[in-house]
Every structure is written in structure tokens, then in C-alpha cells.
């Protein structure tokens, strides 16, 4: 099938022919195009940095390696958050002096899909105008790679989720102590992805009892990620039994 390209990112099935699926070739051209867009938006800046992360899909590590290397080849530094969540990555962009972010995920698509979500310096989706430019640049393949002395670097930031949880708990609008006193109990279906890490950290800090199902990050979803009734039977049973 043809790659899907819109304001929420580029996505497709893994493997096959370029331009028809999400292949290493398509990943390189997409990240190179995004790098060009970033440089044009910051013409007088040096040492530009982006934050990258991925969900729990099996293809995520492979794609992440290509993404980071391509950014570096375009002279852009990378803060690598590793396995993460999209809200955490967006928060990381805002709080690490970054000019953009890239999340490797296909959201609610089946596990044979993966995708690239592009974010601006505010941790938000690109504007319609920038998406049009991104598509144009990725198709024209008109970008200049950096020479040896100007390659970017990679810094691992595996505590980004922890720092994001700290920031959430410090929000003035969140009545943390009141929540702790409620003795709440919840069930969570993490579908073997990044939520398996992030959600328990937040719930524990809020003194919320929780039961996590499908919490093993193994690159395979236990069911389709789209939250339809037929995909929520395990969660419904967990709520009845544990809450």
C-alpha cells in the first residue's frame, strides 16, 4: 500500500518496496526532509537538538537506529529517550531546549505497521504548511548532508518518563494529596507497549492501586490497539475482578 502522509505523521507497513511501505529508504528520506525543515526554521542556530523515542513495536528499535543516524548525518544532535510514550516525548521537547521531536509509533494501527510522528519546538504536531513542505522535501530528495566535522551526536535519556512523572505531580492544578486519600483502584491494558512503564510509575506515586494487563514489552500486541469493544474484553474482565 502507499505510505500514508498527513498532519499526524507518516506511517505504513514494514518491509517491501519503498514508497509503497515504510522501508529504511523511506525513513532516511523522511528524516532528512524533517532535518531540512528544522534547519530552515532555525537558520542562525547551531547545535540543533531533537528528542526521539519509540513505542513497543517489534520494528521500533531498527527504525530508531536509522532515525538517530539520519539526524546525525544532517548535523542534528539527538536526545534518545528510548522506549517512551508520545506525551512524554512532547514534554521532553519542551523541557530540553529542543527544536523538534520524532516519535516512532503507528498509534492504533496493527503491529505490522509503524510510523514517524513529527513535532515542532513546542512539542506539537507540525502546521499544515510545514507538513506540505515536509512531504515536498521527502519526495524531491533535495537536502545536504553534513561533512565529517559537523555530524550530530546522540545522548541517551532513559529517565525521561521519570522526569515527566515528576513534572505531572508538581502541577499546581493536580490535587495530589486528595487523590492519594481516595484509595482508588484501576485496571490498565498496556497492550505490551510504552504505557507498561509509564502508567505504573504515575499511579504508584498517586497511591492508586492498579492491575496492569498485557504489560510485557515483547514487540507483539496481545490484541489490536484500536480501543473498540472487541479489543477491550480483557480489560473489562480485569475491572470486574480487581475493582
What spans do the regions from the language model cover?
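Short, glycine-/Ser/Thr-/acidic-enriched flexible segments
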Residues: 10, 57, 107-109, 123-124, ...
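Gly/Ser/Thr-enriched, mixed-charge loops and adjacent short helices
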Residues: 13, 114-243
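Short, flexible micro-motifs
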Residues: 11-15, 56, 85, 104, ...
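N-terminal small/polar loop signature for handling phosphorylated ligands or for N-terminal nucleophile
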Residues: 36, 43, 49-113, 201-243
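Helix N-cap and loop-to-helix transition residues
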Residues: 6, 23, 85, 126-127
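Residues at secondary-structure transition points
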Residues: 15-18, 59, 107, 121, ...
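An N-terminal, well-structured beta->alpha segment
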Residues: 1-69, 73-74, 150-186
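Short, flexible coil/turn micro-motifs enriched in small/turn-prone residues
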Residues: 3-7, 48, 77, 110, ...
